[in-house]
């Protein structure tokens, strides 16, 4: 009964990125620009890939799915932050907080596993080109995407259920602009030892794709450096450079946030979360399209179709 009453009456206060009103105004304007750019950029990538038959291959199928996840990922937190700032409110219900946390964990994990699938795709294309179409068949690609979604949601569910069982009887100010598991655990007045262990287990599951990416690129570069011509090296960097940039941005900020003790977390760390929740999803379409002739050509065709119609 107490837990049911808590879920219906408890509200959290989202302190924002810095907790300072002047700086929050700056981040409001920043997010007001970032969010539509993220939506439009990633949606254009999806439409360009779907509309151009030349891009109907595993590499671009995975890229289109990454763009879809980035749209959902940024939509979990930014609209709520913008709405709260506009309404002069910082509150979020207990149910809304758990929902936000669930989708952030699920989509964050899904994103990381799709990035691993993309690295595997490049490794197969460069190290086993004759078997590429067999290994990266349409069925295999669908299984890779489906598996990414299943693992992402399977990792998010236990964390959400465990957090829902906690009691919050004191300070209800969340040191972030959205409901993240780390500040929520710090607010609880329950015994959180098991929850912290589960959180680090989740971090371990989140690290598996990074290990897969590292192994894939070791395979890529070991194959490329065996090629006597420098063209092989340049081709590898041209096809893998964009992906490596995205992986570095994403995992660099996430590792800075979660690969450390819970007690070290503070409101100052909320600035780090802006990078992987807002900035990285916005930059991904530019990173993948600016250095990719096929994507740029598909985007031009897409715009020409819209103009001519």
Swiss-Prot record:
One of its GO terms (molecular function) is G protein-coupled receptor activity. Coiled coil: none annotated. InterPro entries: GPCR_Rhodpsn, GPCR_Rhodpsn_7TM, Olfact_rcpt. GO terms for biological process: signal transduction. Glycans are attached at residues 5, 264. The chain crosses the membrane at residues 26-49, 58-79, 101-120, 140-158, 196-218, 236-258, 271-290. It comes from the Eukaryota. Keywords: Cell membrane, Disulfide bond, G-protein coupled receptor, Glycoprotein, Membrane, Olfaction, Receptor, Sensory transduction, Transducer, Transmembrane, Transmembrane helix. It is a multi-pass membrane protein. SUPFAM superfamilies: Family A G protein-coupled receptor-like. It is found in: Cell membrane. Pfam families: 7tm_4 (PF13853). Residues 50-57, 121-139, 219-235, 291-309 are cytoplasmic. Residues 1-25, 80-100, 159-195, 259-270 are extracellular. One of its GO terms (cellular component) is plasma membrane. Odorant receptor. Belongs to the G-protein coupled receptor 1 family. This is Olfactory receptor 1A1.
